[in-house]
Amino acid sequence: MSRDLRGRGCPRGRGFQGWRGGWRGGWRGGWRGGWRGRTQKVEWKRAPEPASSRLVQSTLDQFIPYKGWKLYFSEAYADKSPFVQKTQAFEKFFMQRIELYDKDEIERKGSILVDYKELIEDRELTKSIPNISTELRDMPQKILQCMGLAIHQVLTKDLERHAAELQVQEGLPLDGEPIINVPLIHARLYNYEPLTQLKNVRANCYGKYIALRGTVVRVSNIKPLCTKLAFVCGTCGDVQSVPLPDGKYTLPTKCLVPECRGRSFTPDRSSPLTATVDWQSVKVQELMSDDQREAGRIPRTIECELVQDLVDSCVPGDVVTITGVVKVSSTEEGASKNKNDKCVFLLYIEANSVSNSKGQKTKNFEEETFQRSFMEFSLKDLYAVQEIQAEENLFRIIVNSLCPAIYGHEIVKAGLALALFGGCQKFVDDKNRIPVRGDPHVLIVGDPGLGKSQMLQAVCNVAPRGVYVCGNTSTSSGLTVTLSRDGASGDFALEAGALVLGDQGICGIDEFDKMGSQHQALLEAMEQQSISLAKAGIVCSLPARTSIVAAANPVGGHYNKAKTVSENLKMGSALLSRFDLVFILLDTPNEDHDHLLSEHVMAIRAGKQAVCSSAVVSRTNVQDRSVLEVVSDRPLLERLKISPGENFDAIPHQLLRKYVGYARQYVHPHLSPEAAQVLQEFYLELRKQNQGASSTPITTRQLESLIRLTEARSRLELREKCTKEDAEDVIEIMKYSMLGTYSDEFGKLDFERSQHGSGMSNRSQAKRFVSALSSIAERTYSNLFDLQQLRQVAKELQIRVFDFESFIESLNDQGYLLKKGSRLYQLQTM
């Protein structure tokens, strides 16, 4: 029994040996002999095709009216196919507009821009394809292929017509057909509606055509993606081209030669049958508006793949509108760790068109219309902008609408409003000149509890593009640019920080004094309006054309007027000098002001309409006449105030955001001669008063700041020319800012105090004091002084300081005095 079993079926039986021997001897020998003989004597011959099939195939090729059918569709041509009917409808649509397109540009780029609104508004097209929007959304690949084939056919016919005309002109015979070879052309739709929010991109969107808007936060390197790959059969050497959909590597299943049974294939990347395209991946983060903000949720991101002419169409920080098809990819990293993850997929978008919000000027008119601004205005919005502009005292209305919850501080709000509108950047396109920034920077310094952070958040909220960060929780790379390694490919990619994301907008930085070493990262961004990066072999520069609005608390919790701004904040002069306006907010007790403030707070808490009236303590000393004092009949502060009992209707932030966006986009003011003269006189007067000072805080930066703010004041009222009144308003705001900076502890204006000066506020007094101590030490042969002796010396020299111990501490910090004991100091200048 066992022998029979072994002989019949077991591996070690004779039957198996005989079968194996027969296989080895007969089949292998015959195969080898036949193969060797054929290779030496006879060439491979394909099986003869019947004449009928050859006739049918040639007839099909001859009678297909579309020469590029095989470029777009894999199925055979049929007259009654619905795709043929759609292609004919699109062909009529493009034939009417062929003269509007640049044919050479279309052939060079391999794509054509099609306005979606024109498609759905064309009567003939909607009559032929009634539900075109639904079909485009549900089966985008086929509709886009029909559009591509239609424009391919239109260009082919156009070229044939031109070739025939040339033949007639040259007098050539019209017997032969000209060879017309139009490449594959993609139809790229823009202005597609509706826009899909990123949170709604779920599994039910798979395979659908959608449009979404967001900020580019990461851009990968450009790589070649193989769309068709040639494979060589290892048996017969026949070459076949295999399409690779979505870039997924697939091997051919069998050889195309009927007699060959080969199953091993090697890819031939250098074959003319291999086709590659440029490929790039970008990560897009959703744009958060008021009604879409969700507390505690990280902004959603999605990967988008760009191919061919779409690569390099955006950089980190750009606001883009991407239309494309939602597709899925498997999680390759997770698949190796857990087998269950093979069923988990990631959604990504295969981009069909990218509309960049930069609005850059391009040579091609099509591209210029394509690269729209990131703010779109409906007819209702434009009417609202017109209504706002027609208001009387518009500056007063906008200033008081900026942050109605905060009481008073009209001049500070006016400075923030000017930063919101911004000036005009000069020499942007001129490669031979250095660009001059147009965005003003504002710093608010003051005691805690005066509403600095709320004003900052209000400005970022009103800005069309605002980023709000807190200084003590942000890093320097989080503010500028991060270089991250891509997990899948291992390449380095740029990730934009707060300043790059706030490009052409506002970046609000709260707790500015607690940033530590991150201050140095802001220096280049604040003046050059760009961020340079040199890390891991990548050297590049990213735009950061943003206005920085910062709020800071002084060291010690209370602003000490005996010290300069630099000493109060422990901040370098290089950074402070880049701020156009520095406002000092002091919590000074005033009975009338406190009474109105308490009424305002109680009204807000009770839910009533806020009382917007204000009373501001005068900070100008009457005894000290200076160029900084306001001598106008009706100063700006009086004009900005809301009188008690007045019913003030503030502009809603949503509407104000549209107004600011419209002004920044379409209004580009320039200085009139009268305004320029007013600014020049004020600047020269400041320089004249400052001549005798030991330090010179007034530089050309202050003059540039005045020009920027004057342009912003004109832009606020949608005027193209800056008037004399604009310049006078800006000068009053600048005076208010400088009064806080240059006032000493006694309320007097001291031009020896530099707002960004380092060291002692009272330099001349410190020099006299140290020289007196040096002469005493030489006379007594002792350089040790106790605190009582130091007080006596200061009294004899009539040195008046607000806090004597702080005065001595500052001398200790600067190295003039060395503390030897509890109340003992050693002079170090001997």
From Swiss-Prot:
This is DNA helicase MCM8. Component of the MCM8-MCM9 complex, which forms a hexamer composed of MCM8 and MCM9. It holds the Pfam family WHD_MCM8. Its EC number is 3.6.4.12. It comes from Gallus gallus. ATP binds at G446, D447, P448, G449, L450, G451, K452, S453. The keyword Magnesium does not apply. Residues 394-601 form the MCM domain. It is an enzyme of class 3 (hydrolase). GO terms for cellular component: MCM complex; MCM8-MCM9 complex; nucleus. SUPFAM superfamilies: Nucleic acid-binding proteins, P-loop containing nucleoside triphosphate hydrolases. GO terms for biological process: DNA damage response; double-strand break repair via homologous recombination. The lineage of its organism: Eukaryota, Metazoa, Chordata, Craniata, Vertebrata. It catalyses: ATP + H2O = ADP + phosphate + H(+). Its main location: nucleus. GO terms for molecular function: ATP binding; ATP hydrolysis activity; helicase activity; single-stranded DNA binding.
